[in-house]
């Protein structure tokens, strides 16, 4: 096991917001006033940049990091530990490589919201697939972010063989604005042209967890296509006004790179109409029809929240908490569909942050409540293989969830935020 201590101070900030949250002179105790916003935000990109190496790019949002200082004579600092273990896909009991390192981000009295970029290289070989277990720890807060990543080196056309940037910055989620210019770099000069398939379909929102309605399988059926030229393993492309592009570099399958167009507010809510749509999970059918057919979406959504909140102050708090969950869902669960529309997004919005999440290569299980407690319930999501996204999961639906669903929805409709930590 190699262990490195790396102290890095970052002076370039992506965000301009200034905050005095998460500052301590003494070691902080864990206190969750709003668990919905307690998640460490880490975006990851894997790029097979050569035949023998894979670069792991990390982008850490400092919003939920804890900054502290031993006394008033020194700067506030956040300390993060990064640990990984690399396995061969065919033998996960044998460790190929492992590494731990720490870095410290220093700040003055006014802690600015920013993105912290990091990267490290792995020794990998063409023709092999790997499993990377990644643990990122906020040392001051004593909380972990865990992620298991599959490294695909058998398929030279998989998305990990391409790196996307815009304005010379790495894109961690391949989401862009309408008409934005995107640069794509290939790791090898394998082709001179690529096929761009265009998809402009508006995908529906998730059905309730107990629904027995048939869910249409996602079919590969582009609305249109065009050819783009590649020069020196590099090309630029202008994003569509809506929908997404799927770029294929061969004719034998649909593997390739997907680029998405979302509005400028993303991962937040763009307008009052989308606020109405995202509130479908706690609205009755009649309320939803009334709100979606009105000519004044703002008045309709304000009236709805006031009706369940009972007062302006309470309505504002409910609205804030609900749409914060919508935003977090977009950050965490977006695939070819916005995160709030997905199965995981729906569960997160209604039930809040799980007590525990268990992950493996086949999917995830979310636990709400303490283990071995009869009132504890679980949601199981299965990972779906599709050419557009590796973040597509489908809930295993069951009538068992009906009581829990209506209980949680009733919490919201009674003017209370449902959260397993606060029940």
Segment roles from a protein language model:
Residues 128-138, 240-253:
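Short, aromatic- and glycine-rich surface loops/edge beta-strands on solvent-exposed regions
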Residues 143-151, 254-265:
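Edge beta-strands of extracellular beta-sandwich domains
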Residues 152-177, 260-286, 324:
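Low-complexity, Pro/Ser/Thr- and charge-rich linker/hinge segments at domain boundaries
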Residues 297, 305-336, 340, 344-390, ...:
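A cross-family detector of function-defining hotspots
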Residues 18-222, 229-231:
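Intrinsically disordered, low-complexity terminal regions enriched in Ser/Thr/Pro/Gly
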Residues 122-124, 236-240:
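Short, flexible loop/turn segments at beta-strand junctions in immunoglobulin-like
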Residues 4-13:
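Sec-dependent N-terminal signal peptides
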Residues 268-319:
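Early exported N-terminus immediately downstream of N-terminal targeting peptides
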